[in-house]
UniProtKB/Swiss-Prot annotation:
This is Acetyl-coenzyme A carboxylase carboxyl transferase subunit beta 2. Zn(2+) binds at C30, C33, C49, C51. Its EC number is 2.1.3.15. It comes from Roseiflexus sp. (strain RS-1). Component of the acetyl coenzyme A carboxylase (ACC) complex. Biotin carboxylase (BC) catalyzes the carboxylation of biotin on its carrier protein (BCCP) and then the CO(2) group is transferred by the transcarboxylase to acetyl-CoA to form malonyl-CoA. One of its GO terms (biological process) is fatty acid biosynthetic process. One of its GO terms (cellular component) is acetyl-CoA carboxylase complex. A zinc finger (C4-type) spans 30-51. InterPro entries: AcCoA_carboxyl_beta, Acetyl_CoA_COase_Trfase_b_su, ClpP/crotonase-like_dom_sf, COA_CT_N, Znf-ACC. Binds 1 zinc ion per subunit.
């Protein structure tokens, strides 16, 4: 027996364990239902959990709504400056910009250009909340204004996908001026008889909501998106009243007439395609006094 034990001991080799090099974000936890989801499966659903929770998309991820290889980017060379030489106790504005650019790979919040949906061309401007909270500064406003003017010049609709925390305080009054600048560009788009379709995604606050996003011809919100001007806590502290639990949600805004429809992300492409077809038909039939597009929208 002793010899058997000695022989069996010699047959084993101790192997040190090797830690696997697993990339970050392979599994993503849903903030709502807490389910762990494999990142490729989540990407296939455009980051919508099976429970219906809509996770945030980066600006370039939104371009999946367009026809494949149809998007041509414009104004990518525009980069924000630091006109005020803004310095906070923690960091300078210049440092904050460099870090945001390094982390996101973007020059600023907005990615803009021209693409198509089911073959119909449109100008596109998409916001990325990861870049300094989607804040509206000089480059943000310039890109939005140019997108509207480009749509007017080409005679095509404008689609904006909007998420923002408000004006960028580091640029002061220059940031606030962008609200008026973008709205003026949109008046030229309206004069060209081209529609502006705005999609509001979580979160959408401040100057973006208070200006161009709220004057679009069609305003679409994603389910559960937080939409407003000032934040919930600021309002409660100001009016000293408790607000409803669903206050400032997309569904609350729809109920009170602030948005035209709430559309799940899985249905957004088809909804946009229908809207573009309706507007194209409306444009062709204007001389014949066609049925108003608002009536046609009731069927969506």
């Amino acid at each position: 027996m002793k010899e058997l034990i000695q022989r069996s001991r010699k047959s084993f080799t101790v192997v040190q364990s090797v830690e696997a090099d697993v990339p970050d974000n392979v599994w993503i936890k849903c903030p709502s239902c807490r389910e762990l989801i494999y990142h490729k499966q989540l990407a296939e659903r455009m980051k919508v959990c099976r429970c219906g929770y809509h996770m945030r998309l980066k600006a370039r991820e939104w371009l999946a709504l367009l026809d494949e290889d149809s998007f041509v980017e414009h104004d990518a060379h525009l980069r924000p400056a630091d006109p005020l030489g803004f310095v906070s106790p923690k960091e300078t504005y210049a440092d904050k910009l460099r870090e945001a650019q390094r982390r996101t790979g973007l020059a600023d919040v907005v990615v803009s250009g021209v693409g198509s949906i089911e073959g119909r061309r449109l100008a596109v401007a998409v916001c990325d909340f990861e870049f300094i909270g989607g804040s509206m500064g000089s480059v943000f406003g310039e890109k939005m204004a140019r997108a509207a003017e480009r749509a007017a010049a080409l005679g095509i609709p404008l689609l904006t996908i909007n998420t923002s925390g408000g004006a960028r305080m580091q640029e002061g009054v220059i940031a606030l001026m962008q609200l008026a600048k973008v709205n003026m560009a949109l008046t030229r788009l309206a004069a060209a008889r081209q529609p502006h379709i705005a999609v509001l995604v979580d979160p959408c606050y401040g100057g973006v909501t208070a200006s161009y996003a709220s004057v679009a011809d069609i305003i679409i919100a994603e389910p559960g998106a937080s939409i407003g001007f000032a934040g919930r806590r600021v309002i409660e502290q100001t009016i000293r009243q408790k607000l409803p639990a669903d206050f400032q949600t997309a569904e609350f805004m729809l109920q009170h007439g602030m948005v035209d429809m709430v559309v799940p992300r899985s249905e957004l492409h088809s909804t946009l395609a229908k809207l573009l077809r309706l507007y194209a038909a409306e444009g062709r039939a204007t001389a014949h006094k066609s049925e108003p597009i608002v009536t046609a929208l009731a069927s969506l």
